Amino acid sequence: MGYEKPQIRSTTVIGIIRDGKAALGSDGQMTLGNTVMKHSTRKIRSLYQGRFITGFAGATADALTLLDRFESKLEAYSGKLDRAAVELAKDWRTDKYLRRLEAMLAVVSTDKALIISGTGDVIEPEDGIVAIGSGSMYALAAARSLMKHTTLSAEEIVRESLQIAADICIYTNDHIVIETL
């Protein structure tokens, strides 16, 4: 029996574009193994002069490293989201150090939503909803239903989706932070 490194599990991040407006939110829980370490971790950031909001899931230090790299790519490519995401993904796949990072990013603007995965993939969901993290599938299901059957705003859908995920996923809490564009 050897020492097993505790797995960092945390979070639900969901972003939505609706009616020319975008919202991205996350819960605040950070869990190490089976212990809640923090209830109010901030996992979303506004980037590039407030034109984009990004959120992260996974190992916090890894995610912050990727977030910093992504912000640098946005600056280098004058805020061109697709180009910055693809260039980050290329680096992620080819750099020995980055390849070992365990994190994902979700990014929204008023007209585009992307997921940059832990394998270096760039995914643009066709419904304008991005969700990452341990409770992402619960939040995604809730958001899709709310988008289809209500007239709620992007921010309201994000809030309700995160609350539903928090009610189901043990790695998601109800300390919700949302930013909008």
From Swiss-Prot:
UniProt EC number: 3.4.25.2
Location (main, coarse): cytoplasm
Molecular function (Gene Ontology), one example: metal ion binding
Keywords for the protein's UniProt record, in alphabetical order: Allosteric enzyme, Cytoplasm, Hydrolase, Metal-binding, Protease, Sodium, Threonine protease
A single cellular component GO annotation: HslUV protease complex
Coiled coil feature spans: none
Binding site for Na(+): 166, 169, 172
InterPro entries: ATP-dep_Prtase_HsIV_su (IPR022281), Ntn_hydrolases_N (IPR029055), Proteasome_sua/b (IPR001353), Proteasome_suB-type (IPR023333)
Active site: 11
Regions crossing the membrane: none
Intracellular or extracellular location(s): Cytoplasm
Example GO biological process: proteolysis involved in protein catabolic process
Means of activity regulation: Allosterically activated by HslU binding.
SUPFAM superfamilies given in the database record: N-terminal nucleophile aminohydrolases (Ntn hydrolases)
Keyword Transcription regulation found: no
Catalytic activity: ATP-dependent cleavage of peptide bonds with broad specificity
Similarity field: Belongs to the peptidase T1B family. HslV subfamily.
Role summary: Protease subunit of a proteasome-like degradation complex believed to be a general protein degrading machinery.
Assembly with partners or alone: A double ring-shaped homohexamer of HslV is capped on each side by a ring-shaped HslU homohexamer. The assembly of the HslU/HslV complex is dependent on binding of ATP.
Protein name, entry field: ATP-dependent protease subunit HslV
Lineage: Bacteria, Pseudomonadati, Chlorobiota, Chlorobiia, Chlorobiales
Gene responsible for this protein: hslV
